[in-house]
């Protein structure tokens, strides 16, 4: 077993809107019941709107956009990110979208499949109250739509994020993340939280080296058990 260990996990700020008690409680339970005890202190739950974070003096290295595959950041949480990290001028809220789409064109020919992850620098010219260095573009859907049919969407997305952070050239020690697919995607908070923490668990513990089906099936079956949540 090739274990990456505690060091593979950055500090996560998990953000749920003030009124979204269900996601907050689902995260709290999943951290306790699913995530390895060695990384429990890596997660801080925040019940607030994104725009309230600067007043709390929270800063992070990386902000995650659980976006669509085309990098259009004009709705929901992505719009809140666009407004927080806005450029100058009348169309300043489009600056983040334009930089995101330029990076997508360069690295992915303009389309990032769901559950893939691309890291890009936060543009120097935008407002940056969180002092973030990197935007993690992490599509949970091709276009804004119900994604609840995609049973292991959150697990795959969280794994992609963790691995992108692991392989990034410079250390990313703190990450701001909201629910994956729980808005427009209609993924249930319980499934989202369970799959996020399962991905963390399996990432920390490592996938068996030279594994057989006997080795990997217990890992896969743990994910399968979340499908009905």
Model-derived regions, located:
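Macrodomain-like recognition of ADP-ribose-binding/processing modules
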Residues: 1-229
């Amino acid at each position: 077993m090739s274990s990456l260990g505690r060091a593979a996990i950055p500090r996560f700020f998990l953000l749920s809107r003030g009124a979204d008690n269900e996601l907050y409680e689902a995260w709290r339970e999943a951290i306790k019941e699913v995530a390895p005890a060695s990384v429990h202190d890596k997660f801080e739950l925040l019940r607030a709107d994104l725009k309230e974070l600067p007043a709390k003096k929270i800063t992070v290295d990386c902000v995650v956009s659980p976006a669509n595959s085309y990098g259009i950041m004009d709705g929901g949480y992505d719009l809140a990110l666009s407004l927080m990290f806005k450029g100058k001028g009348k169309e300043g809220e489009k600056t983040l979208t334009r930089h995101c789409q330029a990076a997508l064109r360069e690295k992915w020919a303009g389309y990032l499949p769901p559950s893939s992850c691309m890291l890009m620098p936060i543009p120097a010219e935008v407002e940056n109250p969180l002092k973030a260095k990197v935007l993690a573009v992490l599509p949970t859907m091709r276009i804004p739509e119900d994604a609840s049919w995609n049973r292991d969407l959150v697990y795959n997305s969280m794994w992609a994020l963790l691995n992108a952070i692991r392989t990034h050239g410079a250390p990313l020690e703190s990450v701001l993340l909201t629910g994956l697919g729980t808005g427009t995607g209609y993924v249930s908070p319980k499934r989202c939280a369970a799959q996020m923490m399962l991905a963390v668990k399996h990432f920390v513990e490592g996938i068996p080296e030279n594994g057989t089906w006997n080795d990997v099936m217990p890992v896969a079956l743990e994910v399968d058990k979340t499908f009905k949540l």
